[in-house]
Amino acid sequence: MRRIGLSVAAALAVLVVLAGGVVWWSTAHETPLSRHLPAELKPRTFPTVSTAGLDPSRIRIIENLRREFDANRPGTYYSEGVEEPWCADFVSTVLRDSGLPLRNPNSGTWRIPGVYTLTEYFQKAGKLEPATPYRPQPGDVVLYAPEHPQLRQHTNIVVSVDGDTVTTVGGNQAGGISALTYRVADTFGIVGYGVPVR
């Protein structure tokens, strides 16, 4: 009788460990089933990125994006405690930490809290490329217009371009800091690309 109890307890322990492993694996890796989930339910995995041939400054941007993606901090970390939409704060922080600080054209500080002002910065600095015919590169900042059908006025950073597919990582997106993908041809609502590295 005692052996049966020990066997049952051992079997339950094995099942608990296996179930925990399955839960961990499914939250850390994309599976065929998780591809069809809404963004907020998908596993958080940083996109596959090749940095071969990239400028060292662009590599630093990608490395800092990966670090911030893994940390997944709240928006107030990037906005210096201010409760606000924080996508531009996130971009400002990543670029500053990559050795490419911005300069807010209104306040003179490194942090640019708004997409409109971020766009203005890139325009005045001569670093804004139109959505077409420019082909974005990893490290470029995507600037979305208020008319964009999904994101409205928003910004994030390109991490990879594969054929016609652009993958970005940004803050104040589904799940906090997340990756989004779009096609190069789908430029409606994209103002252009801020190019921090020439």
Question: Where are the language model's segments positioned?
Answer:
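Aromatic- and glycine-rich peptidoglycan recognition patches
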Residues: 2-17, 23-29, 148, 152-198
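Activation targets extended, charge/polar-rich intrinsically disordered C-terminal tails
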Residues: 2-24, 35-43, 48, 96-124
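Alpha-helical interaction segments
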Residues: 14-15, 58-59, 111, 134, ...
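N-terminal capping segments
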Residues: 25-104
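...with weaker cross-activation on analogous glycine-rich loops/strands in unrelated enzymes
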Residues: 51-55, 103-174
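Generic alpha-helical secondary structure signal
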Residues: 56-63, 113-116, 188
